[in-house]
Amino acid sequence: MQQIQRDIAQALQVQPPFQSEADVQAQIARRIAFIQQCLKDSGLKTLVLGISGGVDSLTAGLLAQRAVEQLREQTGDQAYRFIAVRLPYQVQQDEADAQASLATIRADEEQTVNIGPSVKALAEQLEALEGLEPAKSDFVIGNIKARIRMVAQYAIAGARGGLVIGTDHAAEAVMGFFTKFGDGACDLAPLSGLAKHQVRALARALGAPENLVEKIPTADLEDLRPGHPDEASHGVTYAEIDAFLHGQPLREEAARVIVDTYHKTQHKRELPKAP
């Protein structure tokens, strides 16, 4: 199993475990510089990111805000901005956490787009949903939610001349735990290559409250399973996923689940097929 662990870790460009606080600070500086370079290369000056209330978007948001603040200071150009976007579906169960994230990030600008009416209007027009079992329909609509959020973020970025930030990291990438062309769609992914505990380490070092750093992760896309934990969907824990990514020992069954899921979701990590 160790060779497949190494192969997958290499494919996902997994970063080595942090050995010290200096390693954490180095990763923060590296990723802020990456965000800044993406803006410079694009010729654009605005960043857009959806804030969910989870640690991933919180961490990416903190990095983004620091990136534009530093650019303003370095260049004197006040046009560099970060827009944090709330994209609730109706009333979000953990709205308090989302608001706490916004208060922590203190973005240059905040916008709210309730995706509920758009999701409902589209679902009502889809004949393919008719007659589906409730759980299957709920799952499909959950992916619609993720894709509507993508549309909203790109609309804002298009209107304001900006780039959309993604929150994907190695622990989600290995499990394919994102919606294809939904939350998997972005212009830059500053958390790439990080294990889940490393994302938390960055969040903690950036000043995030501990209750948000250690919050139980949930995609919260399905109405029939509100607040359903990521780990319950995975069938393995994030600690096991992180151990796998870093080539450390873990339960044989957990390793098998991760490898099987990685292969099953490979299409999500590839460009569209072409002749």
UniProtKB/Swiss-Prot annotation:
Chain sites annotated for binding ATP: G50, I51, S52, G53, G54, V55, D56, S57, T167, K196, T218
An example molecular function term from Gene Ontology annotations: NAD+ synthase activity
Keywords attached to this entry: ATP-binding, Ligase, Magnesium, Metal-binding, NAD, Nucleotide-binding
InterPro entries the record matches: NAD/GMP_synthase, NAD_synthase, NH(3)-dep_NAD(+)_synth, Rossmann-like_a/b/a_fold
UniProt cross-references to Pfam families, sorted A to Z: NAD_synthase
GO CC terms, sorted: cytoplasm
GO biological process: NAD biosynthetic process
Superkingdom assignment: Bacteria
EC number: 6.3.1.5
Residues at which Mg(2+) binds: D56, E172
Pathway where this protein functions: Cofactor biosynthesis; NAD(+) biosynthesis; NAD(+) from deamido-NAD(+) (ammonia route): step 1/1
Catalytic activity entry: deamido-NAD(+) + NH4(+) + ATP = AMP + diphosphate + NAD(+) + H(+)
Entry binding sites for deamido-NAD(+): N143, R147, K180, D187, H267, K268
Similarity field: Belongs to the NAD synthetase family.
Protein's job: Catalyzes the ATP-dependent amidation of deamido-NAD to form NAD. Uses ammonia as a nitrogen source.
HAMAP family registered for this protein in UniProt: NadE_ammonia_dep
PANTHER family assigned: NH 3 /GLUTAMINE-DEPENDENT NAD + SYNTHETASE, NH(3)-DEPENDENT NAD(+) SYNTHETASE
Quaternary structure annotation from Swiss-Prot or TrEMBL: Homodimer.
Name by which UniProt lists this protein: NH(3)-dependent NAD(+) synthetase
